[in-house]
């Protein structure tokens, strides 16, 4: 890093700033949801669309971000990403209704979807290959600090100012980042193949419509027949994409990816697994505030052990997988996460609050081990010609499944919380207890998929990639 020219180091700082903004936003909002609900006159049990709208937009836009950067230039797209994210933040802060807030989050999601992948692409283009790992470590470090800082910062801003400030703090940072990008970042472009617009539209429509159909009756008052039509339309769009990809060699995601058994199993397991684990960052702060009466600040502080556990486990997960194998690790962590989730609910409802940080630390560790194992299992056996496409598809599936998870969590809260409930009341406890029990079942189900993974205790993605590059 020290050998790099000054202008390159400044460019890395710009990318790191974008990573920080995006990662901070993914965690800072959850703590503020109950306060947003009160301000907007909505039930706190129906605020999940604020999260879903952002994550789903990121999932939809991810496949286009790399192509746009290659075609239009990394500087232009990164600049546009920061501007859109900052404008979205401003409109979020100015929102007076839930629908306005959801639309503003969609705009924010368009910027967020381009920020991280285009940032990675920028690092690849401006840094020599020998220093790429050090540069990526540098720019992703703020992305690890964001989730650690987000819940507590969100709690402080909500408790001592207002929820609007969780979005307003992005504006000065975004202005500085946009100006620095325009002035300092080179605009690399390369020749690209034709973008698969029909495939992109089919996938985007399918993902958006299916997610909407999951919870349209509760959040938007859509009739059951209309929901059934939406579900059928979304499924048809996905099937049409599969037919399109089968006939087109230039499809967005080649069906040849699924000729690799570990990729197919890993992708299916990642999709199902992240539906369950995607509920936890949304449900935990809402449960602590609405279910137990915690202040926003204290609820935010409670999330820090979970992030610390996740960061700590990343250092040893490779050794664990090499020792026990993917199948044992994935089955054990999947069932373990379900048990830890039930333990968290039990400890909280029993009033043993002093144990909550320890349980959340354990939850973060188990979840991190499962995430890392799912990612490497999915990609480890792909040929080099398909590795980039497989990684893009995995990233899209990760975001999609998390949006579905939050949608299902909101649907469960709405289903069990039909009557008006008060903070830290017996009725509220029952609503969250039933919701958490259903969540534990959903979290545990992917163990059935992971039980089919080959028991390859000696194979590891890092090892195979190194061998392949020699």
UniProtKB/Swiss-Prot annotation:
Belongs to the major facilitator superfamily. TCR/Tet family. Residues 1-11, 70-76, 125-137, 186-196, 243-262, 307-341, 417-430 are periplasmic. It comes from Salmonella paratyphi B (strain ATCC BAA-1250 / SPB7). Keywords: Cell inner membrane, Cell membrane, Membrane, Transmembrane, Transmembrane helix, Transport. One of its GO terms (molecular function) is transmembrane transporter activity. The chain crosses the membrane at residues 12-32, 49-69, 77-97, 102-124, 138-158, 165-185, 197-217, 222-242, 263-283, 286-306, 342-362, 396-416, 431-451. It holds the Pfam family MFS_1. GO terms for cellular component: plasma membrane. It comes from the Bacteria. PANTHER family: BLR6921 PROTEIN, MAJOR FACILITATOR SUPERFAMILY MULTIDRUG TRANSPORTER MFSC. This is Putative multidrug resistance protein MdtD. The lineage of its organism: Bacteria, Pseudomonadati, Pseudomonadota, Gammaproteobacteria, Enterobacterales. It is a multi-pass membrane protein. InterPro entries: MFS, MFS_dom, MFS_trans_sf, Multi-R_MdtD. It is found in: Cell inner membrane. The keyword Transmembrane helix applies. Residues 33-48, 98-101, 159-164, 218-221, 284-285, 363-395, 452-470 are cytoplasmic.
């Amino acid at each position: 890093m020290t050998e790099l020219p000054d202008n390159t180091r400044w460019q890395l700082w710009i990318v790191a700033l974008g990573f920080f903004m995006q990662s901070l936003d993914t965690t800072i909002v959850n703590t503020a949801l109950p306060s947003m609900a009160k301000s907007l006159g909505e039930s706190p049990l129906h605020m999940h669309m604020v999260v879903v709208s952002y994550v789903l937009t990121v999932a939809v836009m991810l496949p286009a971000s790399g192509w746009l950067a290659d075609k239009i230039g990394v500087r232009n797209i990164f600049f546009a990403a920061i501007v859109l994210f900052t404008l979205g933040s401003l409109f979020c802060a100015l929102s007076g209704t839930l629908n306005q807030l959801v639309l503003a989050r969609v705009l924010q999601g368009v910027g967020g979807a381009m920020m991280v992948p285009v940032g990675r692409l920028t690092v690849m283009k401006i840094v020599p290959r020998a220093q790429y790992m050090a540069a990526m470590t540098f720019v992703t470090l703020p992305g690890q600090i964001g989730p650690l800082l987000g819940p507590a910062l969100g709690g402080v801003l909500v408790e001592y100012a207002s929820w609007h400030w969780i979005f307003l703090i992005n504006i000065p940072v975004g202005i500085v980042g946009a100006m620095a990008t325009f002035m300092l970042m080179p605009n690399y472009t390369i020749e690209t193949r034709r973008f698969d617009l029909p495939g992109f539209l089919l996938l985007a429509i399918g993902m958006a419509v299916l997610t909407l159909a999951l919870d349209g009756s509760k959040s938007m008052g859509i009739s059951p027949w209309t929901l059934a039509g939406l579900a059928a339309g979304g499924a048809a769009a996905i099937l049409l994409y599969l037919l399109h990809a089968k006939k087109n060699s230039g499809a967005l995601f080649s069906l040849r990816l699924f000729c690799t058994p570990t990729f197919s199993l890993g992708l299916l397991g990642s999709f199902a697994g992240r539906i369950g684990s995607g509920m936890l960052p949304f449900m935990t702060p809402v449960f602590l505030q609405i279910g137990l009466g915690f202040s926003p600040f204290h609820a935010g502080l409670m999330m820090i052990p979970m992030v610390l556990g996740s960061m700590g486990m990343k250092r040893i997960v490779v050794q664990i997988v090499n020792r026990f194998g993917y199948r044992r690790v994935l089955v054990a962590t999947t069932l373990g996460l379900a048990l830890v989730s039930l333990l968290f609910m039990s400890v909280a409802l029993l009033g043993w609050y002093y144990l909550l940080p320890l349980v959340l630390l354990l939850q973060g560790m188990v979840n991190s081990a499962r995430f890392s194992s799912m990612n490497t299992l999915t990609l480890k056996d792909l040929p080099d010609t398909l590795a980039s496409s497989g990684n893009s598809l995995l990233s899209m599936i990760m975001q999609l499944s998390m949006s579905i998870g939050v949608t299902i969590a909101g649907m469960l809260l709405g289903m069990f919380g039909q009557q008006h409930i008060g903070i830290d009341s017996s009725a509220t406890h029952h609503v969250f207890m039933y919701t958490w029990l259903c969540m534990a079942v959903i979290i545990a189900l992917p163990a059935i998929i992971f039980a089919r993974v080959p028991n390859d205790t000696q194979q590891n993605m890092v090892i195979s990639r190194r061998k392949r590059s020699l």
